[in-house]
Amino acid sequence: MLFEELSLSKSIQKAVYEQGYTNPTPIQEKSIPLVLAGNDLIGCAQTGTGKTAAFAIPIIHQLHRIVGSSKKAKQIRALVVTPTRELAVQIGQSFDTYAKYTNLTQLTIFGGVSQNPQVDALKTGIDILIATPGRLLDLHKQGFIDLDHLHTLVLDEADQMLDMGFVNDVKKIVKLTPKNRQTLFFSATMPIAIRELAEMFLTNPETVTVSPVSSTAENVEQRIYFVEKTEKRNLLYHLIKNENLSDVLVFSRTKHGADNVVKALRKNNIAAEAIHGDKSQNARQRVLDAFKNKEVGVLVATDIAARGIDIDQLPFVINFDLPNIPETYVHRIGRTGRAGNGGVAISFCSKDEHGYWKDIQKLIKVDVQKVNDHPYPWHSGSPETAPGGSTKPKNSNRSGGAHKSRKSTNSKQNKKRWY
């Protein structure tokens, strides 16, 4: 399918083609017609699938028709709520790109900065508002935001908002909007708590699910270390010191695990910081800035918190914990090797994660280099003789990601994983 087959206005098509796009991605091809038809929508898609354009393009098309002449009064007709400043900025840039040849204006607001420029822009009048929950509610309470004329509400990265404790804020925001609004709900994963949230806000929604990319970048060198679980921190320190690694993004399966890795590295005089849902917006931004400015050599992140990280030149990614969803591995190591640069993706695999590694291998179909020459190998057994399949580590109940096996456990356990 071509973009020109989606019945979009000429001004939007021109902006899209200027970006070099002729064919919509699967999420765009499925979502854009449904949004244009006025349907509520649940979209399950990870970052990197073209999700933002899947809602930005049809919203711009609809509002361009509604607003028409630039003489018409500016009112907030589309609201995008997203959990972090980084994501809000990226979404705002997308709206600017695709609305380039329309008279629509967008404003991106978030906390941690002065509200005065944001208030000035709101007073001037805007068509599209992209906001983090806290700043949105704050400015609404002060009387600077009027949502009475809202046409479309987008809740983006819903699972991350849940992870960061924004559920009550989101509920408050939805109550401020007209009941006859169109609601678009996007999440990378769909655990029970997210599905319940969607049922509260949407009316007869259409559902679009897009599988993540399964292939890994050719310019990323992949290595796997089979290591005793209790020795992972020692191996991480060993690699950082002996191979002189810097600008390293380390993935941990849990927030608590991320904090513990940082503590262990700091004890060995390694400048490290963690980023996850329990940290405030300002704290996350400070950590990101320090990492980008090379004041911190190692950034430890959970999968959800890492979505807003956009760093072109990232030489090393380390999977301290293997993900329990194979596609997440592809997304993680795709953080390196960007913009024509090479990259190295290193993974640690303990015995109880071997099933995860087998599942990852089935997906990527790449012969990953096994590094046996290191101080912390398995005490007994070998990867070749270890059982395969989706063996779950004992603590897998605490891990993120939507997995079909969750349906066999009660909903209380499911919810605990996501709060």
Indicate where each model-derived feature is located.
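Conserved helicase RecA-like core
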Residues: 2-380
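Intrinsically disordered, Lys/Arg-rich low-complexity segments
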Residues: 382-419
